[in-house]
């Protein structure tokens, strides 16, 4: 019994979660827009900007998305993005949100691929909140990550690529 409890305690310690926070700012550029009907609109746009996180990292990011609006509310938003850290390590993410106001909302992203050093982050899921003012985007992402993922992200600044 003591052995089982010890194993469970150690296992739980290894999966403890850390709140990884990322703040992103970017500029939106609309590529194509169609008024599908009187109340429905399709947009294709890109976002480009910078980011910082609560582990001391920083970098640049970009995203290409498609959006369907009905009465200025988000029906569907999907996109893919790339974040490049200060040491040129990178990750690709996919994101989505739906059924929210166009200028503000909450969604999810997931890491779908990454450079070699960041490959253990594939599958990491985060919640984001976004606000737009004019064509400027303000994002905050929150990810519950394991200590192993935190160690990888903390060591980015120490790695030279």
Report the location of each language-model feature.
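Beta-strand-enriched cores of mature, soluble protein domains
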Residues: 16-161
